[in-house]
């Protein structure tokens, strides 16, 4: 057994029916780790005890195509052309205002012959062959294809040269003597900018990176041979690259960026053993399911990742399964024979991963059994991400400066061009690497911050915290009736904190009265009980001084005060108040958050467009129920864009999301009308949280629902014009300012709307944040609908202005404020509340 067949030995566990193990009608896949990843021995872990438990159903995994082709982008978006319907930018979508700046990108030209074409053939076999490998072997045996550049995925054949006939018939014979008729039918002549060609180019480059000894994990490629170890936290970082080939404004370009994969030097068996010691046996299996199902593990022998969908406690390593050839072998013997690995725990359960078929294949998913001691956990746990020192250690290794990033990119291109196999692959298809793309961007002017008593031009455009000292906010509500709930050992901190809070509040124009202080035991139940007893309807705000950052404290308080008893709440850690040296800045931050939660306004910027409503939409999955989608909708309700209407809805399908947006928009328009006695003249919606391949759904389902909500608000709504902008923070493009033979981060306010953008979209990139360390990331904006017909300069400038209006930070952020508000709202609901917040809080930024 060799190659992929050796990697994937399939069979059925003896003594288990298909119903019992939850397998599909197809064979079982078995995988393992490589030799040396596990210590040989006959010891037994503390979890090695028999459990008479059934197999849970799991919640499904990623599709089989995603498993095999995770690096591919979702090429459905290549067919979504929105610019042609936007008449005001059909001929030109670039702006002109701002100071020109010379930029270097992480894009590289790919040169093709002028008359280059790709020929696509549909291949059929009679009789049909189930084995993809056999289909490829029989086809490639024919001399008609021997001297041609070719690629075959089992159904479609791609050639760089056209065959003589439109339909070509070939005959092959298998080793068993069976005659197979192969028919090749020309289906398409493809040009370089066609979606199929773009997908094809990406396949070629994935193959090239594999030739450079990189391994594909998820969407990206990594070098396990060059790990960066962080031993104090038992972590390994694999350096690698995210890549993509696409057709930009007028060129085919190769896009690459440096990426790191975080791996834990801890197996699932190690994790289970530690969990058992911490929780005890009574709830061990339940906790295993809760903490492991949904995680992604790596089997290091083939550097492939799998999602844990279930844990089967009834299957042990000593049990046998049936291989393809019909023989039976135990898991123990299989790993020993194939990889010289001795399993150390013979009573460990097996992890179950479900691999679904292709998108249009309705068959049941294929089931994979994995050995816990051979599976390494990937990524960082929530506990790890809250560890400041750990995250700092990771950041020190992964945050590359612009110069360091450029050096890594240059090395990648050099490796491709120097590698004979990679170079031959490119030349075979007529591809040649060109120069790195340089272009001219523009830097838009910085903004003035408008306060109650004066206007300030920040000394440092990205942060105006120092400029706001002793300045009054635009408006605030006095806080007279409020509670502080704390444990006994935090009592001595309260007076000093209150004194500081009232002092900074007064200087801001936020009057803070003396609260009612309630002391409780150090348990989540005690805090919640005190709030339930003392939280009468007249209470304006509840502050809880929490003894620790245990999630159950925060979750129980936020859930009760966001939904069951709607009152704005503020949670503060005791250790935060213990830092006397930072008390002033802590009190200022808290005073600003409390002002917003009571309906106050902190600052604004000049908005030339009158009667403008801006909307931010974001979605995420609920942390407890992954089938539930949390939709956050935040809309401005006044002309200076300082007051907000916030709504959060829980849904299950894309159609439900579109329907709920109509309800949310109607509520926002009604709230605007109540506040302004008229409907807005313009609405600009910023839609965040759009994954790859979802752009078409947003355009076809969500935009019509938003339009319908506007038109159904009455005759006045006919003059209300709508724009919808899709926002993406995680884009592959990087920009570097080129100065004096070196590179650095571009200036704040840099806009790119040519050469690195897409010809079929009205899109642009904007840098609205700074990076003190590392390389700054631009945010991508794609205007998919625009009744407002705003000029590119105006749309770009408005977007930049909105990045100044996030009240949880006295500075610029990477996305427009309504998007960040929607993100904060969905995160709170998805992680802590798990149900829709009360509409009584909709007029306040209660989630800051």
UniProtKB/Swiss-Prot annotation:
Gene Ontology biological-process entries: cell differentiation; epithelial structure maintenance; meiotic cell cycle; piRNA processing; piRNA-mediated gene silencing by mRNA destabilization; regulation of translation; secondary piRNA processing; spermatogenesis
Renumbered residue ranges of the record's region Disordered: 1-52
Basic and acidic residues compositional bias, start-end: 17-26
Molecular-function GO terms, alphabetical: molecular adaptor activity; piRNA binding
Domain Piwi, first and last residues per copy: 541-834
The family this protein is said to belong to: Belongs to the argonaute family. Piwi subfamily.
PANTHER family cross-referenced by the UniProt entry: EUKARYOTIC TRANSLATION INITIATION FACTOR 2C
Protein name: Piwi-like protein 4
Source organism: Mus musculus (Mouse)
UniProt lineage: Eukaryota, Metazoa, Chordata, Craniata, Vertebrata
């Amino acid at each position: 057994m060799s190659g992929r067949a050796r990697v994937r030995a399939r069979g059925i566990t003896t003594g288990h029916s298909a119903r019992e193990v939850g397998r599909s009608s197809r064979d079982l896949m078995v995988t393992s780790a490589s030799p040396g990843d596990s210590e040989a021995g006959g010891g037994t872990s503390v979890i090695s005890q028999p459990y008479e438990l059934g197999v849970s159903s799991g919640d499904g995994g990623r599709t089989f195509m995603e498993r095999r082709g995770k690096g591919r982008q979702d090429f459905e978006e290549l067919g979504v052309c929105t610019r042609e319907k936007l008449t005001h930018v059909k001929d030109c979508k670039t702006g002109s205002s701002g100071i020109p700046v010379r930029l270097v990108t992480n894009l590289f030209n790919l040169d093709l012959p002028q008359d280059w074409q790709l020929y696509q053939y549909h291949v059929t076999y009679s009789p049909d062959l189930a084995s993809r490998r056999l289909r490829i072997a029989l086809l490639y045996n024919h001399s008609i294809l021997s001297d041609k550049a070719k690629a075959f995925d089992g159904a479609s054949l791609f050639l760089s040269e056209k065959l003589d006939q439109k339909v070509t018939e070939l005959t092959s014979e298998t080793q068993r003597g069976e005659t197979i008729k192969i028919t090749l039918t020309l289906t398409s002549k493809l040009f370089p900018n066609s979606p199929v060609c773009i997908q094809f180019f990406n396949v070629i480059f994935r193959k090239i990176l594999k030739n450079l000894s990189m391994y594909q994990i998820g969407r990206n490629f990594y070098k396990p041979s060059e790990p960066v170890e962080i031993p104090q936290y038992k972590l390994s970082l694999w350096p690698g690259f995210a890549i993509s080939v696409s057709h930009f404004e007028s060129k085919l370009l190769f896009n690459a960026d440096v990426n790191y994969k975080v791996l834990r030097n801890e197996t699932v068996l190690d994790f289970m053993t530690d969990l058992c010691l911490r929780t005890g046996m009574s709830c061990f299996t339940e906790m295993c399911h809760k903490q492991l199902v949904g995680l992604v593990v790596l089997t290091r022998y083939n550097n492939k990742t799998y999602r844990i969908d279930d844990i089967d406690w009834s299957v042990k390593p000593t049990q046998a399964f049936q291989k393809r050839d019909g023989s039976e072998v135990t898991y123990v013997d299989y790993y020993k024979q194939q990889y010289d690995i001795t399993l150390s725990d013979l009573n460990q359960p097996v992890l179950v991963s479900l691999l679904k078929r292709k998108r249009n294949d309705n068959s049941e998913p294929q089931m994979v059994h994995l050995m816990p001691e051979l599976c390494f956990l990937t990524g960082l746990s929530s506990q790890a991400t809250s560890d400041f020192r750990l995250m700092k250690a990771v950041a020190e290794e992964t945050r590359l400066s612009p110069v360091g990033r450029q050096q890594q990119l240059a090395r990648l291109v050099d490796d491709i061009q120097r590698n004979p196999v990679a170079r031959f692959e490119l030349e075979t298809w007529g591809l040649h690497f060109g120069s790195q793309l340089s272009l001219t961007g523009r830097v838009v002017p910085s903004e003035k911050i408008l306060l109650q008593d004066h206007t300030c031009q920040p000394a440092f455009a990205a942060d105006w915290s120092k400029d706001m000292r002793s300045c009054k906010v635009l408006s605030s509500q006095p806080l007279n009736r409020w509670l502080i709930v704390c444990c006994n050992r935090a009592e001595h901190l309260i007076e000093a904190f209150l004194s500081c809070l009232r002092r900074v509040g007064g200087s801001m124009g936020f009057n803070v009265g003396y609260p009612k202080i309630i002391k409780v035991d150090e348990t989540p139940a005690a805090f919640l009980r005190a709030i339930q007893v003392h939280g009468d309807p007249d209470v304006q705000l509840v502050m809880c001084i929490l003894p620790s950052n245990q999630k159950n404290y925060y979750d129980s308080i936020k859930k009760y005060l966001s939904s069951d008893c709607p009152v704005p709440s503020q949670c503060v850690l005791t250790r935060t108040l213990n830092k006397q040296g930072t008390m002033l800045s802590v009190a200022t931050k808290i005073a600003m958050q409390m002002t917003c939660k009571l309906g106050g306004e902190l600052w604004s910027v000049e908005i030339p467009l009158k009667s403008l409503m801006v909307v931010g939409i974001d979605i995420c999955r609920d942390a407890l129920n992954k089938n539930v989608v949390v939709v956050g909708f935040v809309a401005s309700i006044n002309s200076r864009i300082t007051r907000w209407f916030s709504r959060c809805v829980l849904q299950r399908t894309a159609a439900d999301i579109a329907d709920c947006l109509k309800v949310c928009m109607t509520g926002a328009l009604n709230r605007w009308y109540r506040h302004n006695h008229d409907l807005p003249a313009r609405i600009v919606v910023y839609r965040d949280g759009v994954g790859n391949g979802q752009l078409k759904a947003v355009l076809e389902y969500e935009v019509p629902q938003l339009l319908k909500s506007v038109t159904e608000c009455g005759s006045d709504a006919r003059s209300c014009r709508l724009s919808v902008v899709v926002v993406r923070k995680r884009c592959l493009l990087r920009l570097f300012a080129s100065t004096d033979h070196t590179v650095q981060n571009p200036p704040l306010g840099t806009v790119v709307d040519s050469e690195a953008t897409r010809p079929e979209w009205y899109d642009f990139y904007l840098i609205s944040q700074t990076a003190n360390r590392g390389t700054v990331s631009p945010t991508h904006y794609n205007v998919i609908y625009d009744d407002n017909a705003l000029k590119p300069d105006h749309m770009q400038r408005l977007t930049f202005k909105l990045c100044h209006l996030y009240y949880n930070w006295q500075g610029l952020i990477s996305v427009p404020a309504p998007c960040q508000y929607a993100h904060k709202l969905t995160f709170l609901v998805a992680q802590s509340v798990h149900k829709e917040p009360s509409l009584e809080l909709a007029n306040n930024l209660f989630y800051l």
